[in-house]
Amino acid sequence: MFRKTIVFAALTLISLGELTLVAQIGVIDLQIVDSESKQQIPARIHLWDSTGKFVHPPTLPFWHDHFVCKGRVRLRVPPGDYRFEIERGPEYRIHYGNFRMLPGARESKVIPLQRILDMSKKGWYAGDLHIHRDLKDVPLLMQAEDLYVAPVITWWNQKNQWLNDELPESPLQVVDEKRFMHVLSGEDERDGGALLYHKMPEVFDITEGTKHYPSSMHYLMPIRKMPGVHVDIEKPFWWDTPLWIASGMVDSIGLLNSHMQRKKMLSNEAWGKERDLKRFPGVHGNGQWSQEIYYQILNTGHRIAPSAGSASGVLDNPVGYNRVYVFCGEEFSWDTWWENLKQGKVVVTNGPLMRPLVNGKVPGHVFTAEQGESLTLQATLSLAVQDKVEYLEIVRDGLVIENIPLDEYAKMGGRLPEVEFKQSGWMLIRAVTSNSKTYRLASSGPFYVEIGGSRRISKAATQFFIDWLKERQELVQLDDPQQREDVLRYYIAAEKYWEAVLQASNVD
């Protein structure tokens, strides 16, 4: 009897404790509005308690340290101090705030978000090429990040959502009449790296593939034959990048990729080609290595557009953190966006908002002149930033040739110094922030110069990829002789291709 009394008393104390906690729970209503129109807008919210623990409303899409809402959310939280950051992509200023919740209190806050710039009104439309989020959440995620194009990866090596789920009538879906999501994108990520397949008309099953076999080319070649497919190299430093470039079957490459994150960098190359830590040290080194490889590709005469992807749903990023703005002018559509991306009419960013023109043309343009003539190019730039940017940079043929302080840029009325070309080459414009935790920047796509009908092909850049391929072949890990021969034949063919490029080189 005594034992039962003790148990009953203990349970009573627990119940009273739970009731006390419930009674102390406070309620706060947050409404997010556009500061100018006062209209409610979807947004992303990062909310922490005093211990740094994330607040996670159970009914809203949540990932890592944030959730999204349609613009109004009711939160039930214990007493204490809270801080928050509210964002809607880079086109709105981040709103920082805090509140103290008293026991049983009811509070409300209206949070105005200030729009810095409406890129779509200027003809630039944002997309993220690397999304791993639940399909049912993507429409709200797009609205909360002000994203216009969202290809969602639903098949990925051993994972294939459509083995159990019924395929939709159309893989392309329209969100609030002006945004596009596609539900059949795929990813082949194995020992050679990752290729992203977009605009797929159907699912392509790659679940039979193992880490080392078959070659990524085994899937790339038949997929490339499908009408309208867009193939993206997910990161420049993947081991098979020279192979994929040699194939002529890729359309873009992830200059801003998932190693660049909102609050940190993944400062390694995973299982890709490692960087020289002396040349590319510290937090920014991995991002600079991605740029270096991309510039070497351009220096071999290949014209491949830069792209951007966040890998939200796998890594910590929100959807759209790394984004590519594609210029469509007044002709924005699903197909136009992808076609213009392929043509390089792009700016990639995870922070600064940049709208560059060179001699009145958007990125991707090819300026031509006859042999013996020269071309003078002048860039004009509209720039909006939240993080501090000390310099604007003009990169020509892989080297920074101009560092323009922001105050000088302002005095010049948005004009940058002229660049004279006496031989073929390329240039782009870059704005790197002083953020010390991550590599935050914006880069235009390249502007190309072709004099005398030939592209600039660097011997050193081409040799860089030949050496890379030789190193890659030494890393093939297959004991089965037939499988090994099957994989190596693609590298041998790619090496022959690069040797031919080397023979055609016209600069050191």
Feature names for model-found ranges:
Residues 1-4:
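Positively charged n-region of N-terminal signal peptides that target proteins for export
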